[in-house]
Amino acid sequence: MKRSEQDIRFQWDLTKIYPDTAAWETAMQEAEAALAPLKDLPGTLGTSKEAFKHGLDTVYASMLKVELPYIYAFLKKTEDGSVAENQEMAARSESLLVKFSAATAFLNPEILAIPAEKLDAWMQDEALAIYRHTVNDIVRMRAHTLDVAREQMLALLGDAAGTPKAAFEMLTDVDLQLPMVKNDAGEEVRLTPGTFPVYRESRSRAVREGAFRAMFGTYRQFGDAIAALYGGSVKFDTYFSNQRGYASACEAALDGGNVPVSVYDSLIDAVHESLPSMRKYLELRRRALKLDKIDVFDLYVPIVEDVDYPIAFEDAKDLVKKATLPLGEEYQKLLDRAFAERWVDVYENDGKQSGAFSCGVFGVHPYVLMNYAGTLGDAFTLAHELGHSMHSWFSDTTQDYVNHDYRIMVAEVASTVNEVLLTKYLLKTETDEKRRAYILNHFLESFRTTLYRQTLFAEFERKAHDLYAAGQPLTASALNKVYHDLEATYYDGIGIDADIDPEWSYIPHFYRAFYVYQYATGFSSAVAIAEHILTTGDASGYLKFLTTGGSDYPLEELKIAGIDLTKPDTVRSALRVFDETVDELSALLL
């Protein structure tokens, strides 16, 4: 469906950012002008405390001016990437962002050049209080900060570094056309990124197998091209990490949030320890589906028969509200605003970015992109993305602009708490045994797809980067083998079809290196937080955590909510819940 044919009630209202394209053009001109004062700053920061404050104030004022038109253009492109004007706006705003990065490349080296004793004395001044965490973080990164010229060079390379991701998105969202498949009614229909998740949950094995082979058969045809794009992304990751003196691209990515690599390793180790629980779940799935052998295209179909669980968007809104009642009145009022003020872009349309996301807009409100198709999974996705949005709202309205932006690690906690609360609400209110079993199955699938699957992805990223670091070419064949072997490890006991091998090429998150592990740590943390809220009735620590934004490091912010990820306890505790839930579902079904 074309976007112009959709009901506007189900489209987000971007006029809250800019009323029209002309206003965006004016904002772009103002953003360009805001770069000019930055030219006078190099060489001044260390001259006096007043000059230091003026420099930081100017940088962040310019950043806000540049960021807003960039976000608007990004949202326009994601709503319909086939529109040439949207593509052009995004490209122009991205270029402006690169200019800003280059113009501020002096900042960190110049701050680091200020004698530590002098800088410490300046930072005691309350006028500089909002910059304390930022400056402390810059000082922490001293060993990985380069001189001004090299920092400028890396900043300018940022635009080129984004090319693999941009090309992948254009290929998969706009240019790549999926084949025709048969739906449950036996009709020939065009497979789309939005309908693929629906068909892989089909009760008809022929439908889900057909969709599986059509999807990944198509991606296999583009395997060499996508391998070249992903290989380019890995090369940039490795180049930047080498330039900054890190032992690996993984270490470089995690160090941005002050997260030790041991947290990454601990997650993978804990999940490997729990693979017997996964095998137990896969055997339950095989028996419940009455199959002699279970294959990879059987992993998503609900294993409870004769339960139809479609959820219209209006019903999903109501469910999310009821599930999050334990989070208090203010949270409820914000959800009402999100729906009434059209924060959410609901349905799929031609040219729209696949999947879902939430995007915070400082000084306005967050926006949510959905491709809602009416499944229980879509209702959970809505809860998930609104969790991000509420996190953005609380952070944006509590913190100043300098400290409002939270890190990915804590973001995935806020979103997944909502998913766990929705699960618990459905289990509490549903009395029908088959529907309860259906919900338990969905909870187990959340563990499989968020904790196990994202950890598998994390291992794939590590292995791909290690291959390149060892001088091995990242061909489609090599990457397919890495992915196949991981599938065989994680899903031991089922048929690992060769058509699953190119699934790695379908995952957009890989173009943001070492990002996905935080889904797994976030899910583990969310299970613990939700259990605490529901058993004690106390959400105060969690709500305080939502207001922290980027004012501290993720691991420290999580401690406010009662979570310590430097120890394996949180992940292991979540995996025990998985094992117990397998037993609970087995008792209902077998």
What are these regions (language model features)?
Residues 363-383:
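Short pre-active-site segment immediately N-terminal to the catalytic Zn-binding motif
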Residues 4-6, 19, 107-114, 133-140, ...:
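C-terminal, non-catalytic "cap/extension" segments appended to globular domains
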Residues 1-306, 587-590:
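A well-structured
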